[in-house]
Amino acid sequence: MAKMTSRQLANELKSRLTNDNWSHQFDREKDTLRIEDKQTGKGITLELPPIIAKWEVKPDETLDEIVYYVKEALSAMKGEAQHISGKEKQIYPVIRSTSFPEASSDGIPLVFDEHTAETRIYYALDLGSTYRLIDEKMLQKENWTKERIRETASFNVRSLETVVKMDEVAGNRFYFFRANDGYDASRLLNESILQEYAQKIEGQMAISVPHQDVFIIADVCNESGYDILGQMSMSFFASGTVPITALSFLYDEGKLEPIFILAKSRPKQQ
């Protein structure tokens, strides 16, 4: 299969995202494609290289997924102003990388907390097939505090269904949390899950959240386990629609420490 260029991908997405009310802008220097609603001025900016990497593995599925994501997001943006009061059960925390924007496309500061050296915690209002990140304007309008958002989201993430698959590779066990509800990585914030697995871990407990739709807990019982976890993390990171970090974390006594996975060696903390 020939490698797709950013321009080719942009053209393919344009052909699938045809709407008289939408404009498309391809930025060759930044390798991005922006799809914007002409009436609202709001839109989505797609970073093309990660999509190409995923397309090389799953061509049709990747394009279908991106098109669906853009349509749902633009539809949500065009809808009526979202309210959080009365929708407390629809508020969840979402993990993003520290490079994720701190403000919306309108320049309104998003509500977030620092988490680790690699990650931040943002807060989302679930809208069914999509969600909206909560911003400072929404809090002020409804007289909510950041603490209230944090507590509500923390409570809700503990109520999410847990779907786990375990694989054993070279004497190491890997637990994959994939409920495919958009909040798999958020389960990292459920302390009861971490404590439960900390009790059953026989070796070193390591954690990975390469993108928003996967959360991995590893029971590393020998040095090859670190290499395997590193390879898994990089693979998932490259294929995720919303990548977070390719680095893993050591979990010890309730604390997360980002680590480098070095080939054929034990991890080194940053």
From Swiss-Prot:
InterPro entries, sorted: DUF1444 (IPR010838)
Domain of life: Bacteria
Pfam families in the cross-refs: DUF1444
HAMAP family, A to Z: UPF0354 (MF_01548)
Family indicated by similarity: Belongs to the UPF0354 family.
Name recorded for this polypeptide: UPF0354 protein BPUM_2629
